[in-house]
UniProtKB/Swiss-Prot annotation:
Signal peptide: none
Protein name listed in UniProt: Exosome complex exonuclease DIS3
Subunit-level organization: Component of the RNA exosome complex. Specifically part of the catalytically inactive RNA exosome core complex (Exo-9) which associate with the catalytic subunits RRP6 and DIS3 in cytoplasmic- and nuclear-specific RNA exosome complex forms. Exo-9 is formed by a hexameric base ring of RNase PH domain-containing subunits and a cap ring consisting of CSL4, RRP4 and RRP40; DIS3 associates with the base ring of Exo-9. Interacts with GSP1.
Organism lineage: Eukaryota, Fungi, Dikarya, Ascomycota, Saccharomycotina
The CSD1 domain, residue ranges: 252-399
Family the entry assigns: Belongs to the RNR ribonuclease family.
Name of the top EC class for this enzyme: hydrolase
Note, other: Present with 606 molecules/cell in log phase SD medium.
Length: 1001
């Protein structure tokens, strides 16, 4: 704790002012330490207005010797008097509450963000801070956002007064900035408008002596805009806006209040409260779980009151419930979009899920749902699989973002053109519906829309949000693709001008020098002489058909001593992407390229990814090469790393390469090298498997598009050839070799990838299923034991069963993650799935930022060029790793969602009967995987029988017994059963999502 001890003192320096402040900091032992802080002020910080004639004369270059750009327009937006032509100054709360509005391309132009606002936003919400920084950094001739460093300007810096709170001082600093701008721009007839929702701040601005500041609340300012009708729906629902609604409606639904910060801190310290991230069940939106180190199994959070307004992914504080209330995981399926469909958005009445007393104002839970919940509660209490349960008592950090959804038709009055309260059903089925207010309800009924969440008061059953924009008509390819990109936080906007300015000026005409010692080329690139000329090597690339961003190429050559020279050559992306540039920052932010069925979202601009970096055949390209000497048993004799220049001889698809290798009439040197690579790759794979590497599976399919219409027309299971394994083995070998090299050179900050061993509890249910149904089990003593036990899971009557077990095992594994070497001890570096002690990603720098960092570290390790300080700093490496882990995971989910959408489109007119496998059994349905389409779907009990009440669920045998429709004989369905299902594509009438519907034959 610190308190001002002596009032701040200013003194004049040769080039400006400095402010000296002395404070006393209380120490742990009760003493006090005096600290003197000196704060330097400048007189040359410009206003950045193009109208200004004074500031261009005083401005000085920055550390990169560049002058700041004057961005604010000389003819800004003009509104009615007294505002006229004006710039906007924002306060912190407006930024925090209305960042969506600030990003709207149709409002808020020429905006001044005081530095103190930027600092406060950073302290309160880092995600919003990042979006605000992006607005300011990428500001162009359209939006024109700037940061004004008011804290370092002698004209705008204010000292904290005695007994003044920090918040009041910061508000005064914002007003001082407005006042200075108003006076500074007076000769140019440009006013300044302070937009703040703080009434006291607005009143203070008008009362201050000689103040000519114009102040408006956010709503007041929006109402003055010429396009107010179009953007009014995007105004966030804050408490002050919602008072009329609360007066006019009745609510008896109340969530528990969150614990105070002091109580939370004390509870965490005393061990009675726990912190973790909550994951909502994908099959039951009323059940979540939190993994805590103290417990071997996740702690369950069951019911609306216990979930207490937590969103999927929130960091929460939980308190354990008494052991008498511990339960087993739910055995029923509950979707949020089909639950409480009769709720009235104008009447926030609700159920207390503990006493089930419903309000007379609305039907919240149907009798059928109530019976289902009661039945599930009985099973959960009697089950032998009881787990600890808890309740959420505090939200440490919200995971709120922009969400995609559609209006619930039952909540909309299509005849009304006035403002309505309506529900939005979100695409993520783990999330509750959200109430928004809009005048465009009828217009938006068939649209995919984007919303943001503003708050979730205790008296509201559902969170409150606001409309951001519509993406287009439901089921249009453009709207659905943009929706899934937004849902998975994939950056898909075009690259900014600043990023594109980092690309080579020659564009597509750029060429690698013919000679590496050419004086003119060396003068432009002094490092050129350190490259190895490998253009004489017979190098080729092997990739999926149609690949244009070719990251890697290979070669093999017989050595005089009988060994093999094998080279892996990776695109030298870091030659073009330099640390500290806008291009590097954009690549780091995106983290990875994202591959959808119909498009690719690049991590780097297309000029690099598909041309200058791509190892295309017949042209010279810069590469980073790893060259081994291998013996006939594929043992490494030695390895060398080098920056190089190569010329690929051919670009093969996997199938083309396989045909070339298998064609016995082809005996040229390139083909012989490919055969050698295949032979060595088989030995490499065998050694990996013997060491315990896992051979897992996933239901991957490929969607074929019509060449003329670009519509999806066929789905097939991906076929793997020997050449797929050839490439994979040498990429793995390169990644392992590079990992060892960079760890030796940078033991604290090497960019690596680890895969933790799964805890036995992850396989508990799968092992119970296998033991009960097949008398089999999976061993987790080691990765080798796991691999061997998977090999033994074979059903002689069904060849696919082993693949099914591998698919289900994949879902029990831990996720691999990027990390820097200083974060873990060496034994924890191990990659469990690959059975290697150290691993990284090096071979795909065009599409993965991890590989870019690994390239830079390898260049530093071999003495090619010094390593950037960014990649030597643990804190910065930690931030990079956190981001690329999140982006990598989101990219995978986005790719799967794209396949799921297009598979649904293929099946629209192709209803068929297919073979499926039961992978889950619930109290009210079964989940079936259809390998042909790579989809899994829930078959609800309602679609299995006309009498759901007579069905019986056996949790021990993983069996559901029911009397099928049009039959009088009971049928038993077990997990792992092979079944015939009718597959068709249907659109859910509530969510407007097209999905595969399965019906049991």
């Amino acid at each position: 704790m610190s308190v001002p001890a002596i009032a701040p003192r200013r003194k004049r320096l040769a080039d400006g002012l400095s402010v000296t402040q002395k404070v006393f900091v209380r120490s742990r032992n009760g003493g006090a330490t005096k600290i003197v802080r000196e704060h330097y002020l400048r007189s040359d910080i410009p206003c950045l207005s193009r109208s200004c004639t004074k500031c261009p004369q005083i401005v000085v270059p920055d550390a990169q010797n560049e002058l700041p750009k004057f961005i604010l327009s000389d003819s800004p937006l003009e509104l009615s008097a007294p505002i006229g032509k004006h710039y906007v100054v924002l306060d912190t709360n407006v930024v925090l509450q209305a960042i969506d509005l600030l990003e709207n391309p149709n409002c808020f132009f020429d905006v001044i963000v005081p530095q103190i606002v930027l600092d406060e936003v950073r302290n309160k919400s880092y995600p919003v801070y990042t979006r605000l920084r992006t607005l300011c950094r990428d500001s162009d001739d359209h939006k024109r956002f700037i940061v004004f460093h008011n804290e370092f300007s002698e004209h705008t810096f204010v000292e904290r007064l005695p007994n003044e709170t920090i918040n009041d001082r910061n508000d005064r600093a914002i007003r001082k900035t407005c006042q200075w701008y108003s006076e500074h721009l007076k000769p140019y007839d440009i006013n300044v408008v302070l937009v703040t929702n703080d009434r006291l701040n607005r009143e203070a601005a008008t009362k201050e002596v000689e103040s000519n500041i114009i102040t408006k609340s956010l709503v007041q300012y929006i109402e003055l805009l010429p396009n107010a009708d179009d953007i009014r729906d995007s105004i966030p629902q804050m408490d002050s806006f919602d008072k009329d609604l609360e007066r006019d409606t009745f609510s008896d639904f109340t969530f528990p209040e969150y614990y105070s910060t002091a109580r939370v801190m004390g509870g965490l310290k005393n061990g009675v409260l726990y912190q973790g991230n909550i994951q909502i069940s994908e099959y039951n939106f009323l059940e979540g779980s939190v993994s805590l180190p103290r417990f071997s199994k996740p702690v369950l959070i069951v019911g609306q009151k216990n979930l207490n307004r937590a969103f999927n992914g929130d960091q929460v504080i939980v308190e354990l419930l008494p052991q008498s209330e511990w339960k087993a995981p739910s055995s029923i399926v509950l979707d949020s979009e089909h639950f409480d469909v009769n709720d009235n958005p104008d009447i926030e009445a609700g159920d207390d899920d503990d006493n089930n007393e419903s309000s007379s104002n609305t039907t919240v839970i149907s009798d059928k749902q109530r019976r289902l919940l009661a039945k599930d509660a009985m099973i959960a209490q009697r089950s032998k699989k009881i787990q600890p349960t808890a309740k959420v008592v505090y939200i440490q950090r919200r995971s709120w973002r922009q969400y995609v959804g559609q209006l619930a038709p039952s909540s909309v009055d299509p005849q009304s053109s006035s403002t309505q309260n309506v529900f939005v059903i979100l695409m993520d089925k783990c999330l509750p519906k959200v109430r928004i207010r809009t005048r465009r309800a009828a217009e938006l009924l068939d649209k995919r829309i984007v919303i943001s969440i503003d708050s979730w008061p205790t008296t509201h059953k559902y969170p409150l949000g606001h409309f951001v924009r519509d993406l287009g008509t439901i089921e249009s390819a453009q709207a659905e693709t943009e929706a899934l990109l937004l849902e998975h936080d994939v950056e898909y906007r075009p690259f900014s001008k600043k990023v594109l300015e980092c690309l080579p000026a020659e564009g597509h005409d750029w060429k690698a020098p013919t000679k590496l010692d050419d004086p003119e080329a060396v003068s432009k690139d002094p490092l050129l002489t350190k490259r190895k000329d490998l253009r004489d090597k017979l190098i080729c690339s092997i990739d999926p058909p149609g690949c244009v961003d070719i990251d890697d190429a290979l070669h093999a050559k017989k050595l005089p001593n009988g060994n093999w020279e094998v080279g892996v050559h990776i695109a030298d992306v870091t030659h073009f992407v330099k640390p500290g540039t806008a291009l590097d920052a954009e690549g780091a932010a995106r983290g990875t390229s994202v591959y959808l069925v119909d498009k690719r979202i690049d991590m780097l601009p297309m000029l690099l990814g598909t041309d200058l970096c791509s190892l295309k055949p017949y042209v010279d390209r810069f590469a980073f090469s790893v060259i081994w000497e291998l013996d006939d048993s594929a043992n490494i004799v030695n390895v060398n790393f080098m920056k190089s220049v190569i010329r690929s001889r051919e670009a093969f698809s996997y199938e083309q390469a396989q045909l070339r290798i298998d064609d016995k009439t082809q005996n040229d040197e390139l083909t012989m090298g490919m055969r050698a690579l295949l032979k060595l790759s088989v030995k490499l794979k065998q050694k990996r498997l013997e060491a315990g590497a896992l051979n897992l599976a996933s239901p991957e399919v490929k969607v074929h598009m019509d060449s003329e219409t670009s519509d999806p027309n066929e789905v097939e299971i991906k076929k793997l050839l020997a050449t797929n394994s050839l490439v994979e083995e040498f990429m793995l070998l390169a990644n392992i070799s590079v990992a060892r090299k960079i760890y030796d050179a940078f033991p604290q900050t090497a960019m690596l990838r680890r895969h933790a061993a799964p805890p036995s509890t992850n396989f508990e249910i799968l092992n119970e299923m296998l033991n009960t149904r097949k008398n089999m089990s999976i061993s987790l003593e080691s990765s080798k034991a796991l691999a061997d036990s998977l090999d033994r899971c074979v059903d002689p009557e069904d060849p696919y069963f082993n693949t099914l077990v591998r698919i289900m095992s994949t879902r029990c594994m831990m996720a691999a993650q990027y990390f820097y070497s200083g974060a873990y001890s060496y034994p924890d570096f191990r990659h469990y799935g690959l059975a290697v002690d150290i691993y990284t990603h090096f071979t795909s720098p065009i599409r993965r930022y991890c590989d870019v960092v690994a390239h830079r570290q390898l260049a530093g390790a071999i003495g090619y060029e010094p390593l950037s300080l960014t990649h030597r700093d643990k804190n910065k490496m930690d931030m990079i790793c956190r981001n690329i882990n999140r982006k990598h995971r989101n990219a995978q989910f986005a790719g799967r969602a794209s396949i799921e959408y297009y598979v649904g489109q293929v099946m629209r007119n192709n209803e068929s009967t297919e073979t499926g496998y039961v992978i889950k059994v619930f109290n009210n349905g079964i989940v079936v995987l259809v390998p042909k389409f790579g989809v899994e779907g829930l078959i609800r009990l309602d679609n299995l029988t006309e009498d759901p009440n007579s069905a019986a669920f056996d949790e021990v045998e993983y069996k559901l017994t029911f009397v099928p429709t049009n039959s009088d004989k009971p049928r038993d369905v077990y997990v792992f059963d092979k079944v015939e299902v009718q597959v068709r594509s249907v659109m859910d009438p509530i969510t407007s999502k097209r999905k595969a519907e399965l019906l049991l034959k």
